[in-house]
């Protein structure tokens, strides 16, 4: 059996740990640059606020005192997430951390008759020790555990734990689950499935195996089998990703090409550092930019381009250089850009690089690699980006990011620790 532990409205819950006066009140947490809503309390959901709602559309609620908004405080969220995961890791032999607010627990070795009591004790322990409310779904597969955790979160009668331990419970849950809420289906594939008459998870599992495989391939069949109670989803390999992306919305729209070069250089440098951290290198560097889609009075432009490197790289110089070449090909004057980003993909292990025989300077590559290692070492010791390329901006990466509503760094900064009088 698997248990999916999901922190309820995680970012909002983190803020409430240090603001208990906000319990029962409408709260939202905003994305970078205070752009849009990325976490909502149940009260703000009841007010009709949707995920991704631009902040300017709900700012009047803040001004009227009906809503409290926080800028993202990732240092706080990351620290509290680590505390939650530490409690879970101490409770079971094996844990898979799926995201900042979710983890799968392997329940092997726990008496099936005691699983519900065990999970309820975990809910209480996390709440008491960290202050974060969690919901737990228990089922024979990870996909079913995801569904069970949703019921645990949305129905108070479960008291935080939903057990999907019989076939009758499984079929009832599938009947009540829309197909676009199934892990592995999502909103992109759901319309096509609905056109085939598959509107619920139960509709899906009632289709023959051959029908599923012919229309949805191996991945669709794996989801179908998971919903039938057959474990198919293997443990995620968190060590190496298919792509790495760094992007930000800008506090103020940018039109100047030089300023965009500085921002894109920062994003590319961060991607290169992430590649080195996980021992990987990438062949492809993609740059994309967006104008402000909410400004209908402005011209719109959403370009992107990918540069293929002759040899997979992870040095800051090579990744930044490719990103700037990409930017140069898509930049157009006369547009005001609200967001930009860099994605590195076609990722391979660093120790499995395939070089080219001609036309590539191996000596230069070694110099670039040594320089990147030196930058990483100095910056790690100093705790900030003391060494950077001339193409990058001066100062911290976060400089210029709007965060007018950020809470204190209660757990990670002695200067901002909560004071008791």
Regions found by a protein language model. Give the residues of each.
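C-terminal hydrophobic structural anchor segments
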Residues: 324-381
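Short, hydrophobic beta-strand segments
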Residues: 104-109, 304-310, 354-359
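DNA-contacting surface of Y-family translesion DNA polymerases
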Residues: 181, 191-336
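A generic structural signal for short beta-strands and their flanking turns/coil linkers
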Residues: 23-25, 132, 281-283, 303-305, ...
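Short, charged/polar surface micro-motifs in flexible loops or helix N-caps
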Residues: 10, 33-36, 292-295, 347-351
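Short Gly/Ser/Thr- and Asp/Glu-enriched loop/turn motifs at secondary-structure junctions
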Residues: 98-102, 139-142, 280-284, 335-339
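Short, well-ordered secondary-structure micro-motifs
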Residues: 146-148, 297-299, 353-355
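Gly/Gly-Pro- and Ser/Thr-rich, intrinsically disordered tail segments characteristic of DNA damage-repair
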Residues: 1-225, 233-235, 362-421
